[in-house]
Amino acid sequence: MYPAKPTVATASEPVTGMAAPPVTGIPISSPGPAVAASQWSSGLCACFDDCGLCCMTCWCPCVTFGRIAEVVDRGATSCAAAGAIYTLLACFTGFQCHWIYSCTYRSKMRAQLGLPDVGCCDCCVHFCCEPCALCQQYRELRARGLDPALGWDVNAQKAANNNAGAGMTMYPPTAQGMGR
């Protein structure tokens, strides 16, 4: 009635009579390599490390923000468009809500570069000290070999000319969606 010896499959002997279930669904690509955590290259209150940047950010924060946004968005948003949105938000809300827009780019940048919080959330940093936060982000991009003043296209071209980014930090490709 029962077999004398139970049948056990080993790694060299596949189990017969059992078919693997069919694979269905949408193929999912594996996520890219995890970004290693690193530290900010300068402090939040190190604005005077670059007096030119400090002055530009105090008098025209829309320019500083626009440059940062273009690089963080990898050219998907132009400096002019991001700066204009920042300025319109500042003007139409009485300089009360523009920091909400800029804090989203700080979060994107931290995620791309593996940077830690500076003790509080990104929105709190931008709400309490918008110019210092923008200066820190700008300095960080520069410290990683990206010059926001040049724009994304020139930075990407420089990376391509340096043997696919040797000595220069390149971001992983962006997730693309459908568009016109």
From Swiss-Prot:
TM region(s), chain numbering: 80-102
Tissue and organ expression note: Expressed in roots, leaves, immature ears and silks. Detected preferentially in silks.
Cellular compartments per GO CC: membrane
Pfam families, per database record: PLAC8
InterPro entries associated with the record: PLAC_motif_containing (IPR006461)
UniProt keywords, alphabetically: Membrane, Transmembrane, Transmembrane helix
Entry keyword annotation includes Membrane: yes
Cleavable signal peptide: none
Listed NCBIfam families: A_thal_Cys_rich
Similarity comment text for this entry: Belongs to the cornifelin family.
Name of protein: Cell number regulator 7
Species this chain originates from: Zea mays
